[in-house]
């Protein structure tokens, strides 16, 4: 792909507008505008030609259509809830008034636009300029938005077309881009933004410590987190709920309102802004947030909660800052890292895709040449689960955007393998002046994940808690004390046991719940044994609603009285249980015993 360079300068504190160096966007180009907010969509809206502009989501379109500067531009937004008949009505009115078509649509609503154009005898391939804005989203979102790539086949059929972004992905696999040119807008002045990159092994604790500084001024705080569950958890754990508003997708709005949080919105509106404003990836790109003040901006990543909370330093982070048209006060990214993520370069993932293709093609040939239906069915089943299958459309053709999405996601994960990887990625993006500091705590997010793992047994979970308590030792810092509180919230019984008995005795008791409770009772009453001590031990050993053999009852009661030295073991029989429980005689096969109905004494 050939690259053409155009240059822009800073004038009176603002960057030149795109149309000052590029009066119209040429066809068959990927335009890298480098600087957000220099008016690429504005340039196309004002261009004297019919335009269909594809935007990544609805808030962007609604925001552009509502701007006063476009009130005379005949702009029509198309998204869910706008119907083909509405578009046809707009097109007929546009023809009648002799105006240019200016449609902004989401990828999912693109087909409605095509059908409406055909209904009024307009062929987008020859009669309109088709522009994909924030074009990296096609690659980045296609793994969970299948319809985002639907317009692409028609895109290549259009005579007049282009893709634009401040952060385009230009290393594309689709051979149809080979004839495209790459226009690079080169700023001639320093355009880098200051970034505080704070890596840590404990995201929650670091966020807690940073909040007083971020909230200390009168400026609003915008926090970008691409997980509604994580936003909800952070609001609660950081005690920020009453200060917060959340801007997210329609489904996430319903989810938050369903659990009692009412200030959740699917569209940006400055009138709904609170002191703290949480935003998901829906608001990373294209949206214009125009405020009188310059806010503090924070991004939070937790690689152990979800991969999709990772910000790509080359795209996502650049786009986040670009939302604030009047600038920001501070920009901070708090993130943990995971050394378990393997390190590979981009070529490794491309080679893997090629290898996967060779395997798929070989088995597909065997499927086609199969000797009988049984063999063919077997090959078919194998083909469906091969890695390369996810890159194919229903018609068997390659969806190159899904392949690029895979490579892009794997590379983003590599950035989060260790702090220096993330720092170097930010430096490599050339958009930031980076101040990096690493904050380490005794216990972190990886250790917390081990406690929250629901796949392990209770015994294994308690082993992990004891190991972590041993690692903390004496809780000297607020972070240590908070982590112990978190462990107590996860399982207060084992934390109490550790504090009273210690790791060695718990291990000697092999993490037996009954034996640990018994040891704790004896420890508490050491040197001052009483009838209450005996009662606690009996209640710990026996439970109402269960059957016990006479032998087991006598043996356990004898052990209790011998340990506490409160009664001669020789005087104990199985009938002694009636001193503590209402019970009935109940024999099972060859074993005599009692069914314990209820306790006579509660502590």
What are these regions (language model features)?
Residues 71-115, 259-268:
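Inter-Walker segment of RecA-like/P-loop motor cores
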Residues 107-110, 118-156, 160, 297:
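SF2 helicase catalytic motif II
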Residues 304-329:
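Conserved SF2 helicase motif VI
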Residues 36, 40-83, 108, 170-172, ...:
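Conserved Walker A/P-loop ATP-binding site and its immediately adjacent core
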Residues 166-213:
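Interdomain hinge/linker at the junction between the two RecA-like core domains of SF2 helicases
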Residues 50-64, 104-106, 210-239:
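Conserved strand-helix element at the start of the C-terminal RecA-like helicase core
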Residues 289-302:
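A short beta-strand element within the Helicase C-terminal
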Residues 44-47, 350-603:
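The feature captures the C-terminal accessory region of ATP-dependent helicases
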